[in-house]
Amino acid sequence: MVTDQGGGTSEADGGPVRHIPVLLKEVLAALDPAPGKIILDGTFGAGGYASAILDAGADVVALDRDPTAIAAGQSMMHASGGRLKLVHSRFSDLAEHAPAQGLDGVVLDIGVSSMQIDEAERGFSFQKKGPLDMRMSAAGVSAADVVNRAKVSDLIRIFGFLGEEKQAGRIARAIEKRRAETPFETTRDLANLIETVTPRKAKDKIHPATRVFQALRIFVNDELGELAHALFAAERALKPGGRLVVVTFHSLEDRIVKTFFQDRSGKAGGSRHLPLVTARAATFTPVGKPMVAASEEEASRNPRARSAKLRAGVRTEAPSPGADLSIFNLPELASLARLGG
């Protein structure tokens, strides 16, 4: 499933984007913040969750890999009376910023923030002309680097897996032909090409460029790898009884979170015909339902919530069995380092 992850209205809708914390009531219920607790918000963004957690009396350590978000949050930090700490960091490194006694909760809201989509110069939106960038931080490979340098076979895999784009081959070959004449520099350069190659049909609910832009953003920022590493980091950083709450917006992310909690449940079973058997001590037990979606009322008020899924678990006393990325069965894609030139 492909979705906008930017806030109040989707890119496909074409309306203004504003920040509305998704599933806020459900996130707070799963986290259970209270005075004396320390909660880590791994995706600070515009500070929606962090603000609500502070209001509930807990202290917050908030991370964001985007220096713009950290700068924008300074006023909130100063107003918190020392209860909010802001850190410029990837959330995959969250264990490095946890107190020695451990965390009482970790919340992750996966995806691009409304602030990033709003800024044309960040290059996240195909509806806003800007440099073809898409990096959540200033470092690393840009989307333009990928589009202009990646092999056609690599582009097909990136668009097909990360964007679930059925026309990946056609789009990749058109990119190869165009870049041989003129390199891609702006978001409109790429969006216009995609519109020409795969014109929008009356029945289409999303813009033809939606899936390719999603795929490039996920690839450039290694979002799936970051999420996988962050889940293992949270397992190490949470104290017994601490809670891990993750909100995702499309099937690739949700599959990773679901797989993680299943793997850490202490149960294993090969088919629906065989009973589950204990594999090892569980490191997480479920909080409420296995998956929580937004109510119809919230989805109508905030279109971003339509595809949101929340999964949560409580950390047990069992030791972490260690990080094993193979449980996620992620595909091997092109090397970001190689594409950087």
UniProtKB/Swiss-Prot annotation:
UniProt keyword list: Cytoplasm, Methyltransferase, rRNA processing, S-adenosyl-L-methionine, Transferase
Top-rank taxon: Bacteria
Main subcellular localisation: cytoplasm
GO BP, one annotated term: rRNA base methylation
Keyword Repressor carried by entry: no
GO molecular function ontology, one term from the record: rRNA (cytosine-N4-)-methyltransferase activity
A single cellular component GO annotation: cytoplasm
Localization terms from the record: Cytoplasm
Enzyme class, spelled out: transferase
Region (Disordered): 292-319
Keyword Ion transport: no
Annotated S-adenosyl-L-methionine binding sites: G47, G48, Y49, D64, F91, D109, Q116
EC numbers on record: 2.1.1.199
Reaction(s) this enzyme catalyzes, per UniProt: cytidine(1402) in 16S rRNA + S-adenosyl-L-methionine = N(4)-methylcytidine(1402) in 16S rRNA + S-adenosyl-L-homocysteine + H(+)
InterPro entries to which the protein is assigned, alphabetical: RsmH, SAM-dep_MeTrfase_MraW_recog, SAM-dependent_MTases_sf
Pfam families cross-referenced by the UniProt entry: Methyltransf_5
Gene3D superfamilies: Putative methyltransferase TM0872, insert domain, Vaccinia Virus protein VP39
Purpose: Specifically methylates the N4 position of cytidine in position 1402 (C1402) of 16S rRNA.
Family, per entry: Belongs to the methyltransferase superfamily. RsmH family.
HAMAP family: 16SrRNA_methyltr_H
Protein name: Ribosomal RNA small subunit methyltransferase H
